[in-house]
């Protein structure tokens, strides 16, 4: 990692920390007994932490986000909220997802969806 930092290929973010807390009635409870460690997260939850860390830690960047089947390893709740949450970050200038899940676009993005059948010529 130090080699990558020296070559300008990576940045050291030593002043960044991340805390994840469980929610009660939809609100995070900031206490040590509600703290969730990264190794306790599912693979889908780890993907979400990774995506949002990148989007929110690089404040001076705008992203083009492309997903192929973003629903993999995600609960229905996260399938419904992932794309709207990314767009609401203010750091996403373009978003495209290819999915089999009806939950990914079954939200405020419904009007922006296009089915593959619309491109099939008969």
PLM feature spans:
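Amphipathic alpha-helical domain-onset/packing element
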Residues: 1-13
């Amino acid at each position: 990692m130090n080699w990558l930092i020296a070559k300008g290929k990576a940045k050291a973010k030593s002043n960044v920390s991340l805390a994840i807390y469980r929610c009660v009635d939809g609100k995070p409870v900031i206490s040590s007994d509600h703290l969730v460690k990264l190794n306790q997260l599912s693979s889908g939850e780890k993907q979400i932490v990774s995506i949002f860390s990148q989007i929110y830690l690089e404040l001076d960047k705008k992203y083009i986000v492309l997903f192929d089947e973003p629903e993999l390893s995600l609960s229905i709740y996260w399938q419904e909220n992932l794309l709207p949450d990314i767009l609401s970050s203010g750091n996403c200038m373009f978003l495209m997802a290819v999915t089999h899940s009806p939950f990914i676009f079954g939200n405020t993005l419904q009007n922006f969806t296009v089915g593959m059948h619309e491109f099939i010529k008969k």
